[in-house]
Amino acid sequence: MVFTKEIDLGQGKVLKIETGKMAKQADGSAVVSLEETMVLATVVSKKDAPPANQNFFPLQVEYREKYSAAGKFPGGFIKREGRPSDKEILSARLIDRALRPLFPDGYYQETQIIVTVISSDQLNDADVLGGIAASCALMASDIPFENPMSEVRVGRINGDFLIFPHVQELEESDMDICIGGTADTICMLEGEMSEISEAEMIGAIKFGHDVIRKICEAQRELREVVGKPKRVFEPTIIPDDMKAAIREVAEARLKELAYQPLKKEERADKTAEVYADASAAVLRKYKAEITDEILAENPEKAIYLNEKAINDYIHDIEKHVMREMILADAKRLDGRRLDEIRPISIELGLIPRAHGSALFTRGETQALVTLTLGTKKDAQLTDTLFDDADKRFMLHYNFPPFSVGEVGRMGSVSRREIGHGNLAERAIKKVVPAENAFPYTMRVVSDILESNGSSSMASVCGGTLAAMDGGVPIKSPVAGIAMGLIKEGERYAVLSDILGNEDHLGDMDFKVAGTIDGITACQMDIKIDGLDYAIVEKALEQARQGRMHILKIMDEAITSPRQELAKYAPRLTTIQIPVDAIGAVIGKGGETIRALTSETNTEIDIADDGTVTIASVSSEGSAAAVDAIKLLVSDPEVGMVYNGKVKEVRDDLGAIVEILPGVTGLLHISELSHQRGTKPSDILKVGQKTKVKLIRMAKDPKDPRRTRYSLSMKVLVEPPAEDGQKENE
């Protein structure tokens, strides 16, 4: 049965949901359309029982943008889509993070969601539509997913909020926020802003949530009309007496451990000992009590001998102990207050050859961040369904396994690394100077050397410091902080600068970055239902206070960007040439510009409007390139010296020398040298470069439209002294 529903979102936007027409062999499928952008989402979940020792939910979300959706061919030699782009990976993460917490606890069936953009009007970004389509597919399926989720994008122009703004409108908007949530609560938030206030952020979330409720209501209607009966799902239930036995051997030790302010590695080792000892003790107890005969007659008692179930409940105890310590005693694992920031240390300029560098350490999280400056040629070309563009500021984040004391694969960039780098990049790019003020391409690389929570926000701080150390005239320093939440019923605590364990065992990971004037980027993931706006407001205010504290420490390390670029950074010089002279500078097949860059040891970039950017580590090379280019685009002038190229050599006449592109002159045999009898072929070869001076210009008597140019080499050298003069000397 085909189900179709149109939802009036206001502002002339109508969202269309359809299911039952495409991909009917999947467990669930749906098509969501906005104007002429359409996405197809499918979901399939395995029905086989997961392995007995599995304790995680293997959810895979894939997002693909088909070039055919926009009537385009893929770029490059191979004309078909290949590995996912960064944009596709970021969109998949956006959908995954909103959906994952809404699956029931203990559901461990391998599940795959594939979102495909099948039509793009190049006005609407399909990422949030993919989230809606995925939720619709789940609601129509038999998979135990009961609470619909919707995602929306919110922008703002001239103070007015926009729902699902066009890509072109986002260029004028002072915010680009993606919000994911159910009808009752917000579960995901991500976006970039132009230094907005906390109150403005709350206003945007509330505006988006009103639209989310409408879309969720339509999904419930879809479920009632065409939804399949849900699978029977029974999570593992541990008997009360088994829970008591586990608590008896584990709870006291875990509580004692929680109140000790230990380093990450030491805490992990001691916690692992508790798990091993407690699990072994419980297994010994029940193996002695439950014989094979008893187990054969009572197969339900197998749970008592299930080591995975035992460890899962020990984990629940560990989680409860930490949360209760925070809620009851306002005490954290490392002994800090709820709003206290870990100690921060900063070192600048420690990498000699980098154009800017910073080592930012906050507690047990450390980022080594470097800045590299380049020319427009170094910009990243992004090939998407929308217009291709050059990206002149980029931040790359690396998370090697040694940063958490592990051995791991060193291969391609992970989705997590792409996501964290993108968040840090969005946080800083709002303060990056415009191209006309600072015509460099900037690449910031954050290598995480240690990690115990909030490494992406350390990358924001380190990236800002490296940029300032490198002399990038940013508008204002940016700092980032990760906030956490512990909530039990009506009791809750908001945590500043969370540890890895507080993220893992807590209910929220809310990263907020910004300047002294406002927020520039945020990312929030919620693991619980029922998060009200009072908690979000408290988290944002506490994050603001933490951000001010971090910015103060950063200001003590470096107050403003350095006035000069680093020793090894390229110096950029910009000049303007006539558009019709661009060909003269480039030369046939690029030979002129290649020769220029080689001779002056520079990089030269020419824009379509005639803007020439010259990059050189030395001012001498840059000046030489400027002089050469100005000469190339100027008209021939008597008295000027040119670095000409010999085009023809004739012993009876002299040589024909090209002094400017398409301009040749005669170097007469009499102007070669002060020495008589010199043969041109003895000192000149075709293709040779030689300095000549233009000594005369005259109209060609045979063709007045042409000009004859007379050149000289000998006037550039001193004539030899006479014999009498030599003797007197």
Swiss-Prot record:
Gene Ontology CC terms, in alphabetical order: cytosol
Cysteine disulfide partners in this protein: none
InterPro entries recorded: ExoRNase_PH_dom1 (IPR001247), ExoRNase_PH_dom2 (IPR015847), ExoRNase_PH_dom2_sf (IPR036345), KH_dom (IPR004087), KH_dom_type_1 (IPR004088), KH_dom_type_1_sf (IPR036612), NA-bd_OB-fold (IPR012340), PNPase (IPR012162)
Catalytic activity: RNA(n+1) + phosphate = RNA(n) + a ribonucleoside 5'-diphosphate
Cofactor: Mg(2+)
Enzyme nomenclature, EC number: 2.7.7.8
Protein family: Belongs to the polyribonucleotide nucleotidyltransferase family.
Annotated function: Involved in mRNA degradation. Catalyzes the phosphorolysis of single-stranded polyribonucleotides processively in the 3'- to 5'-direction.
PANTHER family in the cross-refs: POLYRIBONUCLEOTIDE NUCLEOTIDYLTRANSFERASE, POLYRIBONUCLEOTIDE NUCLEOTIDYLTRANSFERASE 1, MITOCHONDRIAL
Protein name: Polyribonucleotide nucleotidyltransferase
